[in-house]
């Protein structure tokens, strides 16, 4: 069940959903707006000749920080990692999705490539996969609305929520834009002809 504004407020009050900082004015009819932090990661295009999700390529991205009152420019065709300002906590009975803001989408800004789902039990800053598919550079300001989270009540609490042993939860408690850790539990099935 998708939570309405009143359900979001009740879940926050009961401790099932936590966003820090909590700003009630960010609550929308069926979502809550989240804001952009000032930390970003860009690809270091000279460190590797290719990306391999099975390998630890620690120098693949470099983190940088912009001043709280300074914009960062995302150029056409550029991809960068960012993060929400809000630290998010979900209890085992709530899952969430991160969606873009339509006003930013109309400017060519994509908030996430594929990783919009947030598991029950997750806590941390949400890493954003930012892309500019427009033909002009776009200023991104720390603290601006960058996306919206909608919440789903599970039919029963997850038996093994994100962060519990054996779930491969390698982003639990993340701070800032966190690079891929796909190599930590890379899986590849053997395919026969």
UniProtKB/Swiss-Prot annotation:
Superkingdom assignment: Bacteria
Q: Which GO terms describe its biological process?
A: dUMP biosynthetic process; dUTP biosynthetic process; nucleobase-containing small molecule interconversion
Q: Where does this protein act, in terms of pathway?
A: Pyrimidine metabolism; dUMP biosynthesis; dUMP from dCTP: step 1/1
Q: What is its EC number?
A: 3.5.4.30
**Keyword Hydrolase in annotation:** yes
Keywords attached to this entry? Hydrolase, Nucleotide metabolism, Nucleotide-binding
Question: Which region ranges are annotated with the description Disordered?
Answer: 162-184
Enzyme superclass (EC):
hydrolase
* Reaction(s) catalysed by this chain's protein: dCTP + 2 H2O = dUMP + NH4(+) + diphosphate
- Could you state a single Gene Ontology molecular function term? dCTP deaminase (dUMP-forming) activity
Summary of subunit composition and partner proteins: Homotrimer.
**In UniProt terms, what function does this protein have?**
Bifunctional enzyme that catalyzes both the deamination of dCTP to dUTP and the hydrolysis of dUTP to dUMP without releasing the toxic dUTP intermediate.
Family listed: Belongs to the dCTP deaminase family.
- Please state what the protein is called: dCTP deaminase, dUMP-forming
Q: Which organism is it from?
A: Bifidobacterium longum (strain NCC 2705)
The upper taxonomy is: Bacteria, Bacillati, Actinomycetota, Actinomycetes, Bifidobacteriales
Source gene?
Answer: dcd
């Amino acid at each position: 069940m998708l939570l309405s504004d009143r359900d979001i407020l009740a879940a926050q009050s009961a401790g099932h959903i936590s966003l820090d900082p909590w700003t009630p004015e960010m609550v929308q009819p069926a979502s809550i707006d989240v804001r952009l932090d000032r930390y970003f990661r860009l690809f270091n295009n000279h460190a590797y000749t290719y990306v391999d999700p099975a390998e630890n390529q620690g120098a693949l991205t470099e983190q940088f920080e912009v001043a709280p009152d300074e914009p960062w420019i995302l150029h056409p065709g550029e991809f960068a990692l960012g993060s929400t300002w809000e630290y998010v906590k979900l209890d085992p009975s709530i899952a969430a999705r991160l969606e873009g803001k339509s006003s930013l989408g109309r400017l060519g800004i994509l908030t996430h490539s594929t990783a919009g789902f947030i598991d029950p039990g997750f806590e941390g800053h949400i890493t954003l996969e930012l892309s500019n598919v427009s033909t002009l550079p776009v200023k991104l300001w720390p603290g601006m609305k960058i996306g919206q989270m909608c919440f789903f009540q599970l039919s029963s609490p997850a038996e093994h929520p994100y962060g519990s042993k054996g779930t491969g939860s390698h982003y639990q408690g993340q701070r800032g834009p966190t690079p891929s850790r796909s190599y930590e539990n890379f899986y590849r099935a053997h395919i026969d002809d």
